[in-house]
């Protein structure tokens, strides 16, 4: 049974749209936990477009589940992670003009530099996950980097038309099995919604799904606690086939 990590970046997006103090993502993280979140995920981007350094400091002091810090593989971010000591770091690619993370890390092309950062973080007691596309080459490179986890990028599945969704789901199944055969633990996320999450949640071997935008969007109608509860029910009791159409 997969657990649920709730990404609260989009709460900070609303705040930053007006450069004001609300909504504050810190108390919203508590509401997500009260709704059943097994962890809180935030992405501290280099341009600080949503989550701010102070948010991260306060979340570290208040989150009672698990704090997963998504960040670019840069010396600045490694230094912040070593100071904050999140429960996990997920290394992700960043491009300044992107609206959201557009793809997985090219671990195979950056293996040397990534290995140094992975080692530095894990020696400090912070488990590292690499956000990768569901491709064998990237999984093998992730294993060689020394990371203990991967997070499979589910964007291609989430964005596929119904005719291609089964193919993308099969890729995720195969990638999960391959990662586990390499000794990696597996999370997944990106673009998952109330309509498409169940088939991914049913994949044997995926330990946690990280989901944000759809939960925050749903919370406008029903409140954050209920939005998290609804998603948690789908993640914990999934149908075995994707809902097409």
From Swiss-Prot:
Chain positions recorded as 3-amino-2-oxopropyl phosphate binding sites: 7, 18, 191, 212-213
UniProt keyword list: Cytoplasm, Pyridoxine biosynthesis, Transferase
Residues with site note (Transition state stabilizer): 151
Binding site residues for 1-deoxy-D-xylulose 5-phosphate: 9-10, 45, 50, 100
Gene (name only): pdxJ
Active-site residues annotated for this sequence: 43 (proton acceptor), 70 (proton acceptor), 190 (proton donor)
Cited HAMAP family: PdxJ
UniProt main location, coarse: cytoplasm
The species this protein was found in: Prochlorococcus marinus (strain MIT 9303)
One of the GO BP terms on file: pyridoxine biosynthetic process
Subcellular location: Cytoplasm
Catalysed reactions listed for this entry: 3-amino-2-oxopropyl phosphate + 1-deoxy-D-xylulose 5-phosphate = pyridoxine 5'-phosphate + phosphate + 2 H2O + H(+)
Name of the protein described by the UniProt record: Pyridoxine 5'-phosphate synthase
Stored SUPFAM superfamilies: Pyridoxine 5'-phosphate synthase
Transferase among keywords: yes
GO cellular component: cytosol
